[in-house]
């Protein structure tokens, strides 16, 4: 928790978001059906957690391979968070975002404390869940005839995000090289369960 507080303070000190950037995000917010807003609320919460997973990793790990991996993927997850946030009203976002930040930080920091392979096992578990999560939403949108331009734009965002998450999963699997042992498998099962619970909560709160 102390690492989390220090990292949070550093991020606040270095924040450089501009008013122009914020105006662009507001300009892109569109009117969407309630069910799609619910899906996007879970996506926004999930991408928030993903950003903080990498912050958690970077706050602990000194392994150069892990740090390069985390820094590169953090940039991608920040872009995902912005893109999804650009089509979801602030008032429709999960009210539990502080919880998702802390949960994400812990999910990244714990495996980084144990070892580099655990980081990659964790990312594989997270991205496997996210791949399936996005796929369901994309299929639902694909099933709608005469999709309006706003919803088509959302589908394009989800497809791009999903492609990135699949690439993250495959890269983590490749770098890990060895199959996880029993304890690592139990940890990954816990991460997957936590992801399912988070989606259910974010959809409602």
Q: What does each model-found stretch correspond to?
A:
Residues 1-205:
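Non-heme di-metal
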